[in-house]
Amino acid sequence: QSEPAGPPQPYTFSYDNTDEYGTRIAQEETGDENNNKVGSYSYTDPNGISRTVKYVADAEGFRVTVETNEPGTKTSNPADAQIVSNAATDSYSPSPASSPAKPPSLAVNAAPITIHAVHASPVVHAIHAAPVSYATAHHVTPVIALSHAPLTYTLGRAKSA
């Protein structure tokens, strides 16, 4: 494991971006020399539906509050996360991004259909088997196994009867 390089350094960063469709994404955070963090991040879609998360992380733990107007949400406090909802009580129906599709229209008139009679004719094709030959050269290196084994000699005379 590596040792920390030193005490936490204070920092601040943020960004706020809106794309060409109108979706906005933003975040900001500040950290201090005691490693405490305070920040938020948010998302807003082109229809105005938004969610903002505000958080604090310090010696007392991580605490978060979510502010939203997302349909189907209500103010609650699950898992010690405060959710504040400003959602309308009626149902949500987003505006259509484009008009409904229309059936395609024909640009040209169809050409008349011509029918030709097809007559079967015999196919004459001679099939001859081609000779198969394989020429391979195998170069085999002789293997000589040498091993040193003890030899036992018995010297003496055979006993006479």
Curated annotation (Swiss-Prot):
It comes from the Eukaryota. Residues 1-10 have a biased composition (Pro residues). Keywords: Chitin-binding, Cuticle, Pyrrolidone carboxylic acid. GO terms for cellular component: chitin-based extracellular matrix. One of its GO terms (molecular function) is structural constituent of chitin-based larval cuticle. Residues 87-103 have a biased composition (Low complexity). InterPro entries: CHIT_BIND_RR_consensus, Chitinase_insertion_sf, Cuticle_Struct_Prot, Insect_cuticle. Residues 1-44, 67-103 are annotated as: Disordered. Pfam families: Chitin_bind_4 (PF00379). The modification Pyrrolidone carboxylic acid is found at Q1. Residues 67-86 have a biased composition (Polar residues). Residues 8-74 form the Chitin-binding type R&R domain. PROSITE patterns: CHIT_BIND_RR_1, CHIT_BIND_RR_2. PANTHER family: CUTICLE PROTEIN (PTHR10380), CUTICULAR PROTEIN 47EF, ISOFORM C-RELATED (PTHR10380:SF173). Component of the cuticle of the tick. Binds chitin. This is Cuticle protein 16.8. It comes from Ixodes ricinus (Common tick).
